[in-house]
């Protein structure tokens, strides 16, 4: 097969992933392309898919089949997603018949459901991401608060995406906005602190 790779679409942390993927294609024909070089091949390879695309849209539209590389959902910047024709719910990951060996490599210790805690954390998303397909995010925040208040009077902590702050007025005195704090490593924030004594996460 013939592949066109677009390494300049790549995020900083993903460059080693892109290079590893390039090396995995050693038995195929590969073109390393600038973002404007749309080479007629079987598969285009690019980094991520965003709503506004940041110059990626011509690449995405040109190739009928594309491989999308993306940061992993678990152990961010230690794991990665490789999918066909999209990310998250819109992608094909080739994971229909897989065993649990990959899951075991995460070495997670799953805890029981908490039965107590002081607050409920609501995690937001960046509306410029393809991971977001709902209406206006401010309306979403307000709706989530309303729905939680139907079943709980616990304190609510709104924790927005680091690149998408909450931008509406809070009228409930028991709702707090907690902007994620950078903790030194690339793309690592203080979420674990927020989880201490949390009753639930939305």
Provide a role label for each language-model segment.
Residues 5-10, 142-188:
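Catalytic donor nucleotide-activated moiety binding site of glycosyltransferases and closely related
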Residues 49, 57, 186-202:
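A donor-sugar binding/catalytic signature common to diverse glycosyltransferases
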């Amino acid at each position: 097969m013939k592949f066109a790779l677009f390494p300049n679409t790549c995020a900083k942390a993903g460059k080693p992933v892109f290079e590893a993927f390039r090396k995995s294609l050693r038995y195929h024909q590969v073109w390393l392309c600038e973002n404007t070089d749309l080479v007629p091949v079987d598969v285009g390879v690019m980094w991520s898919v965003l709503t506004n695309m940041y110059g990626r849209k011509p690449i995405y539209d040109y190739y009928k089949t594309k491989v999308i590389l993306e940061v992993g959902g678990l152990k961010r910047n230690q794991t990665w997603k490789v999918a066909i024709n999209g990310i998250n719910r819109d992608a094909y990951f080739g994971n229909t018949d897989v065993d649990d060996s990959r899951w075991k490599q995460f070495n997670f210790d799953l805890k029981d459901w908490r039965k107590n805690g002081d607050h409920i954390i609501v995690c937001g998303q960046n509306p410029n991401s393809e991971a977001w397909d709902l209406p206006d995010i401010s309306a979403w925040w307000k709706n989530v608060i309303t729905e939680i208040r139907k079943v709980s009077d616990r304190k609510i902590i709104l924790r927005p995406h680091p690149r998408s702050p909450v931008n509406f007025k809070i009228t409930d005195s028991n709702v707090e906005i907690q902007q994620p704090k950078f903790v030194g490593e690339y793309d690592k924030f203080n979420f674990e602190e927020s989880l201490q004594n949390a009753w639930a996460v939305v």
